[in-house]
Amino acid sequence: MSRMIFLALLVLLLLGACQSQVDLSQPPEIRYGEDVCTKCGMIISEARYAAAFYTVQGEARRFDDIGGLFIYHAENQEDVAQFWVHDYETEEWIKADQAFYVTSDQLHTPMGFGLIAFSEQDRAQRLASKSNTMVMSFDEILMSFVDGSAEHEHFDS
C-alpha cells in the first residue's frame, strides 16, 4: 500500500513539474501596469516599447524599453532562448532577430533609448525617413550596445 501511495505522489510531482515548465518558443507574458522592468525596476506600461526573453533555463526577463533589453544582455550575457520585441504600430510580439529597428533622439521611449521595432521593413523605412535616420538589423543594434555606442537618455513624462 505504501508503495502505491509513493508511486501516486511521484506521478503527481512529475505532472506538476511538467505543467510549470515554460514554452521557450513563446514570449514571456507581461502584465502591463504590474510587471517591472528587469533592468530599471520601473513598471512596464506600454506594449509598443516592451521587450522580453526567456533564459535557456526558463527564467523570464521583461523590459519597459527595447534598449533596456539590449543593454541588460550586453552587461549580463545570459544564454537566451529567444529575444522578443513588440511591433511599434501593431503591438504584436515579433522575434527580435526578425525585426527592423529605427532609433532616433526624436523617439521618446520609456528609458530614452529612442529605439523601436517593426515586423515589416517598409513601415520601419517610412518612419526612418521621417526621422532622418536609417533602419537597422538586430545584429547592428546588438553590436551598438555591446560596443557602447548606443545612447541612453531618460525622459520625464
Where are these regions (language model features)?
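Sec-dependent signal peptide recognition
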Residues: S2-L9
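C-terminal motif of bacterial Sec signal peptides marking the signal peptidase cleavage site
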Residues: L14-A17
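Short aromatic-glycine-(Arg/Gly/Cys) micro-motifs in beta-strand/loop hairpins
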Residues: E46-Y54, I94-T109
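Bacterial signal peptide processing site
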Residues: Q19-Q21
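C-terminal partner/receptor-binding element of secreted or periplasmic proteins
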Residues: S119-S157
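Short, flexible, mixed-charge glycine/proline-rich loop motifs
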Residues: S25-G33
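Mature extracytoplasmic domains of secretory-pathway proteins
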Residues: R62-I94, F100-Y101
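Post-signal-peptide N-terminal segment of Sec-exported extracytoplasmic proteins
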Residues: Y32-I71
